[in-house]
Amino acid sequence: RVAAKEGELFTPALLRSRELWQELGAGYGRDILLPAGALSVAPSDHPDLQPTLASIEHFDLPHKIFDAAQMRLRFPQFHIEDDDIGVLDLLGGAMRPEMAVAAATDQAFSHGASAIYDTEVLDIVETSNGVLVRTSRGEFTADRVVVTAGPWTARLLPELRDVVQTKTFALTWLMP
């Protein structure tokens, strides 16, 4: 999605992220992003919809808004309350995560990166000579590292605990 319920502050980064994923996919010869749209459904006065609508207006994002009757016709798979509306972010969609990882890894390798698989990272320490990575298989040094630890980021990099927060979101993907 590009119209962010977290607020307009995120929209430029989301737009740029979308461009970068499209570029990566084009370089890989495969579509990483599937342009399916992103539908938000809530009562019309729900606080999460206001920032989404503000992002749409401020950045003139392509979208569609459906009232409850239109939602029931277009999306019969959902139980729609009378005061619900649907906001369809036409730039939203789904990502193929395995393909994204493969494409990003291939691109990193083409720029001289290396990877160590099936190894638990215990610690990452910045040193005057670069980065020291302590693992279950020993220590490695590098000029720089890319950390993609997902929900383990705060444990691995405790200094980011206040900045990086893992949240679970329930998502539903449906075929038209």
Where are the predicted features?
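Short amphipathic alpha-helical/adjacent loop interface patches that line ligand
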Residues: L14-W21, A108, G150, F169
